[in-house]
Regions:
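Secondary-structure transition/capping motifs at alpha-helix termini
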Residues: 109, 130, 264-268, 286-293, ...
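Flexible loop/turn segments at secondary-structure boundaries
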Residues: 65-66, 96, 168-169, 190-191, ...
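Generic beta-strand/beta-sheet core signal
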Residues: 89, 154, 162-163, 174, ...
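Conserved short alpha-helical segments that host acidic/polar catalytic motifs at enzyme active sites
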Residues: 1-203, 208-267, 273, 361
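Phosphate/diphosphate-binding loops
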Residues: 140, 188-189, 196-197, 204-205, ...
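A conserved beta-strand->alpha-helix junction
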Residues: 113, 118-121, 292-303, 400-418
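PRPP-dependent phosphoribosyltransferase catalytic core
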Residues: 142, 157, 194-200, 352-454
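Short, glycine/charge-rich flexible loops or terminal/linker lids adjacent to PRPP-binding catalytic cores
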Residues: 289-334, 345, 372-378, 382
C-alpha cells in the first residue's frame, strides 16, 4: 500500500514541494513517515519496505498556505482520540482558520502545528466524540469550515474523501483492476498508479470507502454555487489532468488562442516558459500562424519557482532552472507565453535570459489576467503589497520586466478557457465567494511572543 501511495505522490509532486508524508493503516495500527523535502528525498526504497502491507494509506505533498515549512507541519496529520485514531491530509486553505483556532484555544485546545489542517483535525475530533460514526463527525465539522478544502481522512476502518461546498480545489477517485479505490487531487495520479478514473468528487460531497464499497453523502452543506479555482487550469494542475470534465491541456491551449486574437504581434517565433506556459504557447502559435519554437532547456531537478517558499530562493532558482537556447533565440522577434506574473521577479529574469541569448524583441503574453488580489483559498499570495499589477500599469510592468510589449488574458475571456462561468477568479477581480478574514498572512500562527496581541 505504501508503494501505491508513493507513486501517487510522485505524480502530484508539482502540487507541493515543501514536505511530504505517508501513513499506512495496518488493521487499525498506523505506521507513518513524514519529513521536509521532495518525495524522492523523504522516501528511500528501505523506507518504503519498512511499512506494513496495510489495507489503506493516506499520502500528501505539501504546498503551505497556512503555517511555515517545518517538520511539525508535514502531513498527513495523525490524531489519537477517545474513539480511535485518524490521519488527515488536506489541500486548500480555510478562510476562517484564525477564528476557529482562537475559539478552540479558548476552549483549551493545544496545537502542535501552525497549519489549518490541524484545525480541521481538532474540529472533526470534537464532533467524533458526540457522533455515531466518523462520517457523521466529518459532516458536522464541514458546517463550521469556510474556504477551500479537499481532504482525505483515514480512520481505523474507513477512508473518507470530502470536498468543500464550492469545489474550490479538485478531487477525484478511481479504481484499480484489483478493486483498490484511489482518491487523488488530480486524475494524472490515478493514471500513474493504474487506476481507472471513476468521477470527480462533487462539491460538498463526502465519499466513504469501507469493506462494503463506496457510498456518498451530500445532505449536510446545502447547495452552493460551484466556484472551482480557475488558477488550477492556468497554473497548478498538470496538463494531462482532467478536472471537473475539463482538460487542463485544452484550457491552456484555449488561453493561447485567445491571446493571439486579443494581443496580436508581428513575430518570428512563439515560445512558452516551461512548463505551464508551453500549452498556451502552442495554442497561440496554432491560432496566429507564427511557428512554435523551443526557447528554453529546463533543469528537471529543481522545483517550480512560484510555489517555493521565500523570495530569496526564487531569485536563485530561475537561472539554475532555465537556460535559453541561443540557436533558437538569436536575432528573433519572440512571443513569450507564461501563465502569470505575480511579483515580476521570475518574468524579469526570464526576459533577461532571452536578451542575453540574442533575442531582437521579446513580446510577453500572459495566459491569465493581472493578479490583483490575495487568495484565501490555497494560493500562496497573501498581500497586495507583493502583487506587481496592484502598483503598476501594463506598460510600466513591461518596462520593469524588460519586455517590448506585454499583454494579459482579458478577464472576460476566462469563461472561454473552460466553457463555464462556474469558477472562482477572486485573485483577479476581488469577488470572493466566502467572507474573507481580517488576518491573512501565511505565518499568522507563528509570530514571536513580542509580536502578539498588537
Amino acid at each position: 500500500m505504501a508503494d501505491l501511495a508513493y507513486y501517487g505522490l510522485y505524480a502530484l509532486q508539482h502540487r507541493g514541494q515543501e514536505s511530504c508524508g505517508i501513513v499506512v493503516n495496518d488493521d487499525g495500527v498506523f505506521a507513518s513517515r513524514k519529513d521536509i523535502g521532495l518525495v524522492n528525498e523523504v522516501f528511500s526504497r528501505d523506507d518504503l519496505m519498512k511499512f506494513p502491507q496495510g489495507r489503506m494509506a493516506v499520502a500528501h505533498a505539501r504546498y503551505g498556505t497556512t503555517g511555515g515549512n517545518s517538520r511539525a507541519n508535514c502531513q498527513p496529520i495523525e490524531v489519537n482520540h477517545q474513539k480511535g485514531k485518524m490521519a488527515l491530509a488536506h489541500n486548500g486553505n480555510l478562510s476562517n482558520a484564525y477564528e476557529l483556532r482562537s475559539e478552540l484555544e479558548l476552549g483549551g485546545a493545544i496545537f502542535h502545528t501552525t497549519s489549518d489542517t490541524e484545525i480541521i483535525a481538532y474540529i472533526v475530533t470534537q464532533a467524533r466524540l458526540n457522533s455515531p460514526s466518523i462520517e457523521n463527525a466529518l459532516s458536522s465539522a464541514m458546517s463550521r469550515l469556510e474556504g477551500a478544502y479537499s481532504l482525505v481522512l483515514m480512520s481505523a476502518a474507513k477512508l473518507l474523501a470530502a470536498r468543500d461546498p464550492y469545489g474550490f480545489r479538485p478531487l477525484c477517485y478511481g479504481k484499480t483492476l484489483d478493486g483498490t479505490y484511489v482518491v487523488a487531487s488530480e486524475s494524472c495520479a490515478l493514471s500513474a498508479v493504474g487506476a481507472k478514473f471513476e468521477r470527480d468528487i462533487l462539491p460538498g460531497e463526502i465519499l466513504v470507502f469501507d469493506e462494503n464499497g463506496v457510498r456518498s453523502n451530500r445532505d449536510h452543506c446545502g447547495e452552493k454555487p460551484r466556484r472551482s479555482c480557475i488558477f488550477e487550469y492556468i497554473y497548478f494542475a498538470r496538463p494531462d489532468s482532467v478536472i471537473d470534465g475539463v482538460s487542463v491541456h485544452a484550457a491552456r491551449r484555449n488561453a493561447g488562442a485567445i491571446l493571439s486574437k486579443t494581443h496580436p504581434v508581428e513575430a518570428d517565433v512563439v515560445m512558452g516558459v516551461p512548463d505551464s506556459g508551453i500549452d498556451a504557447a502552442l495554442g497561440y502559435a496554432e491560432a496566429s500562424g507564427i511557428p512554435y519554437g523551443m526557447g528554453f532547456i529546463k533543469n528537471k531537478y529543481i522545483g517550480r519557482t512560484f510555489i517555493s517558499p521565500g523570495q530569496d530562493k526564487r531569485i536563485d532558482q530561475v537561472r539554475i532552472k532555465l537556460s535559453a537556447i541561443s540557436e533558437s533565440v538569436k536575432d528573433k522577434r519572440i512571443v513569450l507565453i507564461d501563465d502569470s506574473i505575480v511579483r515580476g521577479t521570475t518574468s524579469r529574469q526570464i526576459v533577461n535570459l532571452l536578451r542575453e541569448a540574442g533575442a531582437k524583441e521579446v513580446h510577453m503574453r500572459i495566459s491569465s489576467p493581472p493578479f490583483m488580489h490575495p487568495c484565501y483559498y490555497g494560493t500562496d499570495v497573501d498581500s497586495r503589497e507583493n502583487l506587481i499589477a496592484c502598483h503598476h500599469s501594463v506598460e510600466e510592468i513591461a518596462d520593469i520586466i524588460g519586455a517590448d510589449s506585454l499583454g494579459y488574458l482579458p478577464e472576460s475571456e476566462l469563461k472561454n478557457l473552460i466553457g463555464s462561468e462556474n469558477f472562482c477568479s477572486a485573485c483577479f477581480n476581488g469577488v470572493y465567494p466566502t467572507p474573507i478574514p481580517d488576518v491573512i498572512t501565511k505565518d499568522r500562527f507563528e509570530g514571536k511572543l513580542s509580536e502578539r496581541n498588537k
